[in-house]
Design a protein with these regions (language model features):
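Signature of multi-pass transmembrane helix bundles
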Residues: 1-124, 282-290, 296, 300
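Juxtamembrane helix-boundary/capping and inter-helix hinge elements in multi-pass membrane proteins
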Residues: 36-41, 49, 80, 116-121, ...
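Hydrophobic alpha-helical segments of integral membrane proteins
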Residues: 43-61, 87-90, 94, 120-131, ...
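Small-residue-enriched core segments of transmembrane alpha-helices in multipass membrane transport
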Residues: 51-54, 90-107, 124-134, 203-217, ...
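Hydrophobic transmembrane alpha-helical segments of multi-pass transport and channel proteins
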Residues: 98-103, 134-139, 172-180, 211-223, ...
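Helix-loop-helix junctions within the multi-pass membrane cores of secondary transporters/permeases
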Residues: 133-214, 282-287, 291
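Interfacial segments of multi-pass membrane proteins
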Residues: 190-194, 229-239
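Cytosolic juxtamembrane C-terminal amphipathic helix followed by a basic/polar low-complexity tail immediately after
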Residues: 262-303
Length: 303
């Protein structure tokens, strides 16, 4: 049986990275901490401006050309027959990941219920609309209003001040479903492309760094995997083909990953409420200052 090879590349433009991923990560963390420690207002403003510049480049340049990159890579894989051989594996992986989401949510709500002393199902059953909205939008930011409404319907046991503080915060920094999915996918694709999974030490480093990167990832479709592309290529050493596979397979289940993120926020809000009750923190009325318009009725804070 003869093997199929792609024609030679006519033109290729290699753009090397400015610095290694680890150097960029350590520099960003130390620079941010030092700016806070020294109260360097000018540097903080510069970093904020730089963040907006980077986000503008990502949204206006990287994301628009990303579908073409994935499409051309998959054309090559289809020409070689790789897609046909691996399609059942992809579908099985997506189903396993979705089941993993439910298992993790059960664990998370179980821990929240044990810590707070409340029935976590009273919170979980209010997250049906938010879960479906997240499946449809694939965006934590777009689902925030529905998540606030569901969390407010769960008060009690949730406290409204904890809801108004915690839910918007967790929607941006708590991406448990996306992180769980990405870790599973990189191991699977590493096995498929390279013939072996990444080493344990490499995966531990990747998971630790991914947790940091996920906190700063935007709550938009594909935000987590886009923010961690440097880790995928730098730490795991994935090439163009493996990276394109990660992006594509991640997009197949991004709806359910986002839904897991949003639904898990309710468990964290329950933990936050339990912490406030255990430490005698009185309930604040400041949430009324945040939702004192007519929109309050739409998100459930007004009766």
């Amino acid at each position: 049986m003869c093997s199929i090879h792609l024609p030679d590349i006519v033109f290729q433009l290699d753009i090397p990275q400015i610095m290694p991923v680890m150097s960029a990560l350590v520099l960003s963390i130390l620079l941010g901490l030092a700016a806070v420690w020294t109260h360097a207002d000018l540097m903080c403003k510069l970093l904020d401006e730089f963040q907006r510049i980077v986000l503008a480049v990502v949204t206006r340049v990287v994301i628009p050309i990303l579908p073409f990159f994935i499409a051309t890579t998959f054309c090559g894989l289809a020409y070689e027959g790789t897609i046909t051989r691996q399609l059942p594996v992809f579908l099985a992986v997506v189903l396993i990941v979705i089941v993993g989401h439910y298992i993790w949510l059960a664990i998370l709500y179980g821990i929240a219920g044990a810590y707070s002393g409340e029935n976590p199902l009273r919170v979980l059953r209010q997250y049906g609309p938010a879960y479906l909205t997240a499946v449809g939008t694939m965006s934590s930011a777009a689902t925030l209003a529905v998540a606030l409404q569901g969390a407010n319907r769960a008060a009690p046991p949730l406290r409204r001040d904890m809801v108004s503080f915690g839910i918007p915060l967790f929607a941006n920094i708590h991406l448990c479903g996306s992180v769980l999915t990405e870790v599973f996918f990189v191991m699977t694709i590493g096995q498929m492309i390279n013939g072996s999974m990444p080493e344990l030490s490499t995966m531990i480093l990747f998971c630790l760094l991914l947790g940091v990167f996920a906190i700063g990832a935007p709550g938009v479709p594909g935000g987590t995997v886009m923010a961690s592309l440097g880790l995928i290529t730098g730490v795991l050493g994935f090439g163009d083909t493996a990276t394109a596979l990660v992006l594509t397979v991640f997009a197949l289940q991004d709806s359910f990953g986002t839904a897991c993120n949003i639904t898990g926020d309710g468990a964290l809000a329950l933990m936050l409420t339990g912490y406030a009750d255990r430490h005698g923190i009185e309930e604040s009325d400041e949430h009324r200052q945040l939702f004192n318009t007519e929109d309050e009725k739409k998100i459930g804070f007004a009766k």
